[in-house]
């Protein structure tokens, strides 16, 4: 697939120190209305929350659902040419990553090139044969972008790095300088914070209370029968929304600065995501997951804060839930890693956030 598309190979990454007068969030805002912009913000002082990342000006887009995928590649005129394929999405992404990734160890950056975006839950259908119980929302199962510029801010050192890929189809430094100039000029654009409105009625669940209680009873019966040992009973909340999704993103980050905030400008839809929990991190040949089970509010006084932390640490229920998830993740990772290489380096670690305490394992 990649060869048929004549995709370029990244031969180098130009990395420059980069200073600007804007906050990182305001700098990213200049790109927030352009499709393919991905913003990753890190809040708190946890060891997994060191970097802010902006990926912008994509030269490749990958979108699709089911057996229909579209790879769009920017042409010499600045437009995009779409190539349809029915290739397995995981095989396609694997081929693209191998083609487009570039490991640069000069500055110990978390990323210098690659694909940014999301995988939807419905991609599970490519791996597992499970019942279809959800109403489709019309959004793609996969949405990924390859940026031509990445800005990284180190929250510890306050240093900024601008990463510009060099392709084998570039004729010299001219193309790289053009990408840098585009980015700098974009930062000079005037910008005023947007606004948004959510329905006053609030969030509406996909479950009515009787249906939810009935589902709980069904799960309990499955547990008794030995059909399952764990279930994640999920419900979907929705409300009417209008306005600037990036403004919502910034407002949520201001109120609860969790380690993993993500904004994806996907053109006809936007994704705003926040979580204190790392699902997966792959660095070289190492895979890390950080499940969280166990949450309690921060106290209003130092004494109450300490008491809440102690209560959570001693909670038998939360300990059991976290231990079960750790065992589940160990099993899942063992399926794709070397035999006897999975280990728990930290278990039931108490982490303090602005509004809550969490129990975390690594």
Residue ranges of predicted features:
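Extended alpha-helical targeting/anchoring segments
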Residues: 1-362
């Amino acid at each position: 697939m990649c060869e048929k598309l004549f995709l370029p190979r990244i031969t180098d990454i130009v990395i420059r120190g980069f200073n600007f007068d804007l906050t990182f969030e305001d700098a990213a805002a200049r790109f927030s209305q352009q499709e393919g912009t991905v913003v990753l913000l890190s809040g708190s002082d946890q060891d997994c929350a060191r970097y802010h990342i902006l990926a912008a000006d994509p030269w490749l887009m990958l979108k699709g659902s089911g057996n229909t995928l579209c790879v769009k590649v920017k042409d010499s005129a600045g437009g995009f040419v779409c190539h349809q394929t029915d290739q397995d999405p995981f095989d396609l992404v694997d081929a693209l990553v191998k083609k487009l990734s570039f490991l640069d160890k000069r500055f110990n950056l978390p990323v210098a090139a690659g694909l940014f975006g999301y995988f939807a839950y419905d991609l599970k259908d490519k791996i597992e044969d499970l019942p279809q119980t959800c109403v489709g929302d019309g959004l793609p199962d996969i949405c990924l972008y390859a940026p031509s510029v990445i800005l990284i801010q180190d929250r510890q050192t306050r240093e900024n790095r601008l990463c510009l890929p060099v392709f084998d189809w570039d004729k010299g430094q001219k193309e790289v300088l053009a990408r840098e100039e585009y980015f700098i000029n974009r930062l000079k654009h005037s910008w005023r914070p947007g606004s948004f409105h959510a329905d006053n009625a609030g969030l509406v669940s996909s479950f009515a209370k009787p249906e939810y209680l009935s589902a709980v009873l069904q799960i309990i019966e499955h547990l008794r029968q030995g059909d399952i040992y764990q279930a994640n009973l999920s419900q979907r909340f929705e409300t009417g929304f209008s306005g600037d999704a990036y403004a919502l993103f910034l407002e949520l980050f201001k109120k609860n600065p969790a380690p993993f905030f993500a904004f994806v400008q996907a053109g006809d839809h936007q994704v705003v995501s926040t979580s204190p929990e790392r699902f997966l991190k792959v660095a070289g040949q190492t895979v890390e997951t950080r499940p969280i089970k166990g949450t309690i509010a921060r106290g209003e006084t130092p004494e109450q804060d300490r008491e809440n932390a102690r209560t959570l640490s001693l909670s038998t229920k939360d300990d059991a839930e976290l231990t079960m998830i750790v065992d589940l993740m160990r099993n899942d990772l063992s399926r794709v890693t070397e035999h006897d290489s999975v280990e728990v380096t930290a278990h039931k670690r108490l982490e303090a956030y602005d509004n809550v305490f969490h129990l975390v394992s690594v």
